[in-house]
Amino acid sequence: MGKQCYVTGRKASTGNRRSHALNSTKRRWNANLQKVRILVDGKPKKVWVSARALKSGKVTRV
């Protein structure tokens, strides 16, 4: 499984990079994911969590 937020499901999104001549090539916007230890079913587990989920208090560190 690739890098994806364990809580919110956020992951990298894709789009186009545009030059001044309006040529397009593919690019990615990566989500701000942090590897943190959280409690899952009463046991600590290391998972990828988005910074937005950490700041909003949807998950607490161990």
Curated annotation (Swiss-Prot):
Going by the UniProt record, its keywords in alphabetical order are:
Ribonucleoprotein, Ribosomal protein
Look up the record and report any one GO term of the cellular component aspect.
Answer: ribonucleoprotein complex
Q: Which GO BP terms sit in this record? A: translation
Identify the SUPFAM superfamilies for this entry. L28p-like
Q: Which InterPro entries match?
A: Bacterial_rp_bL28, Ribosomal_bL28, Ribosomal_bL28/bL31-like_sf, Ribosomal_bL28_bact-type, Ribosomal_bL28_sf
Q: Where is this region: Disordered?
A: 1-23
From the Swiss-Prot or TrEMBL record, what is one GO molecular function term? structural constituent of ribosome
Q: Which family does it belong to?
A: Belongs to the bacterial ribosomal protein bL28 family.
Q: What is this protein called?
A: Large ribosomal subunit protein bL28
Species source reads Staphylococcus carnosus (strain TM300)
| Gene transcribed to yield this protein | rpmB
